[in-house]
UniProtKB/Swiss-Prot annotation:
Residues annotated as transmembrane: none
Natural source organism: Escherichia coli O6:K15:H31 (strain 536 / UPEC)
Function statement: Specifically methylates the adenine in position 37 of tRNA(1)(Val) (anticodon cmo5UAC).
EC number: 2.1.1.223
PROSITE patterns: N6_MTASE (PS00092)
Name this polypeptide is given: tRNA1(Val) (adenine(37)-N6)-methyltransferase
NCBIfam families membership: tRm6a37MtseTrmN (NF047853)
Matches recorded under PANTHER family: TRNA1(VAL) (ADENINE(37)-N6)-METHYLTRANSFERASE (PTHR47739:SF1)
Sorted UniProt keywords: Cytoplasm, Methyltransferase, S-adenosyl-L-methionine, Transferase, tRNA processing
Lineage per the UniProt record: Bacteria, Pseudomonadati, Pseudomonadota, Gammaproteobacteria, Enterobacterales
Amino acid sequence: MSQSTSVFRRNGFTFKQFFVAHDRCAMKAGTDGILLGAWAPVAGVKRCLDIGAGSGLLALMLAQRTDDSVMIDAVELESEAAAQAQENINQSPWAERINVHTADILQWITQQTVRFDLIISNPPYYQQGVECATPQREQARYTTTLDHPSLLTCAAECITEEGFFCVVLPEQIGNGFTELALSMGWHLRLRTDVAENEARLPHRVLLAFSPQAGECFSDRLVIRGPDQNYSEAYTALTQAFYLFM
């Protein structure tokens, strides 16, 4: 199995069924987003929401994984990123199924009457600190424009009773996010702790919350095996997307 991930051209990534340019986005497409887009439960969903769409990566991954009848709304605050997401989506096989909205999610959600079976977000998680190179990158990295309580409240306002709200976060921040979500009435239903290899502690966590109570399923995902090739589990999760798997 090849170790190459995706062909690099024009400041983006070529996946098996679509290309993502991200040179105008503050936060680039990377492993976190790919993990989340491949992992989020999509069985039976009819409508999806991507909060903080960036380059459109998550919306495109969900489109690839779902039936042609599933509609996806992708909301992005930063205008250049939203424009690039729209371009990426227009060049994909699913342009008619994904709607990009250049908007503040906290305002956009108040105007919606539909509810979503799946809400997905690769959210900012840094507190205000070291100054970023651009205001756009600061907006993407820091919780100043969308803090975690606001994100959880926003998702709660537009999710179906049996829907899932899925995020990817650094391990320790994910633990705090989980405590906050539980205190706000969410129920943790799925958790996958992600480690680079068996010898390392998990550095990322994938979380799926629901308004509906139920059993929580937890597991661990190791990205690379002892030979430094991608593990069987990581390959099984992502091979529908990576070009050379």
